[in-house]
Amino acid sequence: MTSYRNFGIVGGGAWGTALAQLLAADGAPVRLWAREADVVAAINAEHRNPVFLPGAPLSSSLTATTDLAAMTDLDALLVVVPVPYLRAVLTELPPGDAPLVFCSKGMEAGSFAFPVDMARDLAPGRPHAVLSGPTFAHEVAAGLPTAITLAAADPALATELAQALARPHFRPYVSTDVIGAEIGGAVKNILAIACGIVEGAGLGLNARAALISRGFAEMTRFGLSRGAKAETLAGLAGLGDLVLTCTSANSRNFALGQGLGRGEAIETLMADRRTIAEGAFSAPVVAAAARADGVDMPITDTVARLVAGEMRVADAIQALLSRPLRPEGQ
């Protein structure tokens, strides 16, 4: 049985920093790579990340670097890089045999590749896994109770990684359904934007509940069409994450939707953010993949058109409400 003790984190955003703090809180050495020099300097000198995770004190055993070549001699790497930039980082990652645990959510434009698909191309032979579920970074960093899915095709790898990551307040549930975990994470971000639009436009809780329910039906159709298991989509990485991010402005995607619902321009909302609302990038990609697969995803398609500036919120609401009536199971 492999023992994973020495972890590295690739990505210094809020989620990467929170995972690093989770692992370093008991004094274990953790190495984090970030592209931003100011983030690295603050972590090393002040033990905090005021850019992406303000207010969270960090362990002195957490060290940071801007040198990706330094991410070697580690037992496992948690890769927490937004999907639009993931291929470039994987290309630069030094070779090795440490497992890659992908913690970002989304689908690559053009290739329709998920993070694990990119790893097969760019890091062949390296074991890989997915960590996904209902998590807000600031709560994990603060040690609040969290449950999450850890999926790997190799059940032994999933179990060993889960045991290494588990803490009294952080409970990974093991799965072998990698594609289900990836699809749940990608689609829920899109639906969180839709629910934020409902909130921002003042359309009420009934409308939000309907969007969550019908959005979950879209997630399930898309997931099953690509080989995901229904229980994964109904679990932490799917429905659990969907409920969390569709009901709180702490979600970047929900907050982006709120702005759209209030009538703010997508360009302004995106320009004001140093952090990434992953759903804005995932929406057009998942919508295109669904069309190619012949899967009906009207909410996803509508969000894709909204973030592309092709549709006004009022027209989007009318389009969804005027769709033909159908049985609920469809």
From Swiss-Prot:
Catalytic activity: sn-glycerol 3-phosphate + NAD(+) = dihydroxyacetone phosphate + NADH + H(+); sn-glycerol 3-phosphate + NADP(+) = dihydroxyacetone phosphate + NADPH + H(+)
Any single GO BP term: glycerol-3-phosphate catabolic process
Alphabetical UniProt keywords: Cytoplasm, Lipid biosynthesis, Lipid metabolism, NAD, NADP, Nucleotide-binding, Oxidoreductase, Phospholipid biosynthesis, Phospholipid metabolism
Binding positions for NADPH per the UniProt entry: 15, 35, 105, 137, 252, 276, 278
Domain of life: Bacteria
Recorded metabolic or biological pathway in which this protein acts: Membrane lipid metabolism; glycerophospholipid metabolism
GO cellular component: cytosol
Active site positions: 188 (proton acceptor)
Compartment(s) where it occurs, according to its Swiss-Prot or TrEMBL record: Cytoplasm
One GO MF term: NAD binding
Binding annotation for sn-glycerol 3-phosphate: 105, 133, 135, 188, 241, 251-253
EC number: 1.1.1.94
InterPro entries reported for this sequence: 6-PGluconate_DH-like_C_sf, 6PGD_dom2, G3P_DH_NAD-dep, G3P_DH_NAD-dep_C, G3P_DH_NAD-dep_N, NAD(P)-bd_dom_sf
Membrane spanning residue stretches: none
Family statement drawn from the similarity comment of this UniProt entry: Belongs to the NAD-dependent glycerol-3-phosphate dehydrogenase family.
Described purpose of this protein according to its UniProt entry: Catalyzes the reduction of the glycolytic intermediate dihydroxyacetone phosphate (DHAP) to sn-glycerol 3-phosphate (G3P), the key precursor for phospholipid synthesis.
Protein name: Glycerol-3-phosphate dehydrogenase [NAD(P)+] 1
Classification lineage: Bacteria, Pseudomonadati, Pseudomonadota, Alphaproteobacteria, Sphingomonadales
